[in-house]
């Protein structure tokens, strides 16, 4: 997203490299390993991805995914391309791979055909330690012999009090072993997996990605209508199943328990970015963003805390339990712009710029002090800072 503004070749190389390790069934792993890179957890030997008949032979990957922003990123590169012909050639090559990625999600992760896909691990949400997952993960009462051996690397570089607890990592590791023991066969995983969640952020970004893939299809002379229809189906399903009228926000749904997860987090306002709510619901969401525990209109707070600051598990510096994340602010900013909430979007834009210039490119920031925490050279923070700094909004070519 950042390279697109000044290094088109680098931007296309980054995306292409990831898709070079796409699985045969369309799964796009969240990690492609460099075997020359030093110690990392979870590393190559932890995943046992090779047990899947769909995993690539020529590279080593993880066995889980991340939110499907890739079609959106490809369109982002095209809209900022200095060499438009090269950009069209690039997304011509990527178009079938993007299609296979989305088809995998709807085929394997939406078995009832609702239009909503599920995630099967907290890591797949991108919000590993969110309090959304607490009630789901607490159902996993593990015996010592059920916990795979592992050694955390994160707490050697970041304060332990800012990171997930060891008990959470035990459950993260157990789920990976659960997948590997079933050879990453989605049907077998689905039969007994204790973590199957229809996540708001993931589905909102998938809906937006299908909208953007439809735009790419049109630019390539392909029929965009099936993609547009699928995006509308996802938006409709989110509005029917995930909307919380009382609180003016969308909620994740726990498939194993058959109920919504009543935890209020800023990422669950991201449906604005995909134009999922109607104008009335969008107004409710903006009110939630301004007046509830997210405090967009509160000048004493650095917006937007990732979790309701009045919530039971709020902690201003602990991973996804309160800190401000630039990527969530960026998504909310763009969503607010889509609905014409320019003043609120401007506050988020100014926050992104001031956090990065005053503190640096940190992984996340304390909403009560504005201080940076986590990694101090975090790539998506830098990338989105560049996007915000270099232009206020994308062109629509």
Predicted regions and their residues:
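Internal, well-ordered domain-core segments that constitute the primary functional module
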Residues: 66-137
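Short amphipathic alpha-helical segments
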Residues: 327-331, 344-351, 356, 360, ...
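Aromatic- and histidine-enriched alpha-helix N-cap/loop-to-helix transition segments
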Residues: 1, 6, 61-72, 93-97, ...
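Extended, well-ordered alpha-helical scaffold segments
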Residues: 7-20, 84-105, 209, 220-238, ...
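Surface-exposed helix-capping loop/turn segments at secondary-structure junctions
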Residues: 110-114, 215-225, 242-248
């Amino acid at each position: 997203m950042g390279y697109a503004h000044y290094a088109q070749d680098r931007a296309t190389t980054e995306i292409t490299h990831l898709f070079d390790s796409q699985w045969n069934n369309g799964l796009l792993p969240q990690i492609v390993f460099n075997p020359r890179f030093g110690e990392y957890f979870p590393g190559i030997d932890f995943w046992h991805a090779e047990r899947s008949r769909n995993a690539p032979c020529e590279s080593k990957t993880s066995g889980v995914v991340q939110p499907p922003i890739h079609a959106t990123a490809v369109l982002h590169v095209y809209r900022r391309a200095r060499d438009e012909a090269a950009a069209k050639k690039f997304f011509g090559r990527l178009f079938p791979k993007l299609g296979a990625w989305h088809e995998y999600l709807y085929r394997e992760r939406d078995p009832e055909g609702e239009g909503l896909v599920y995630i099967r691990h907290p890591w797949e949400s991108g919000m590993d330690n969110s309090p959304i997952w607490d009630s789901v993960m607490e159902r996993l009462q593990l015996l010592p012999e059920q916990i795979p051996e592992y050694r955390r690397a994160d707490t050697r570089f970041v304060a332990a009090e800012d990171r997930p607890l060891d008990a959470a990592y035990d459950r993260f590791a157990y789920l990976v072993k659960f997948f590997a023991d079933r050879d990453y066969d989605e049907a077998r995983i689905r039969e007994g997996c204790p973590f199957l969640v229809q996540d708001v952020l993931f589905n909102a970004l998938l809906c937006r990605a299908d909208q953007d893939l439809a735009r790419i299809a049109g630019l390539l002379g392909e029929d965009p209508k099936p993609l547009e229809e699928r995006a509308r189906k996802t938006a409709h399903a989110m509005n029917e199943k995930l909307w919380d009228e009382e609180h003016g926000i969308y909620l994740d749904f726990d498939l194993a328990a058959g109920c919504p997860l009543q935890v209020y987090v800023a990422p669950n306002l991201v449906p604005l970015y995909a134009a999922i709510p109607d104008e009335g619901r969008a107004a409710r969401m903006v009110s939630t963003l301004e007046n509830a525990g997210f405090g967009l209109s509160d000048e004493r707070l650095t917006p937007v805390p990732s979790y309701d600051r009045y919530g039971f598990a709020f902690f201003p510096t602990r991973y996804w339990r309160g800190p401000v994340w630039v990527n969530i602010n960026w998504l909310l900013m763009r969503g607010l712009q889509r609905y014409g909430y320019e003043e609120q979007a401007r506050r988020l834009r100014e926050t992104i710029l001031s956090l990065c210039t005053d503190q640096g490119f940190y992984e996340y920031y304390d909403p009560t002090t504005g201080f940076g925490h986590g990694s101090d050279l975090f790539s998506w923070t830098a990338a989105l800072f560049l996007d915000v700094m270099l232009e206020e909004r994308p062109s629509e070519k």
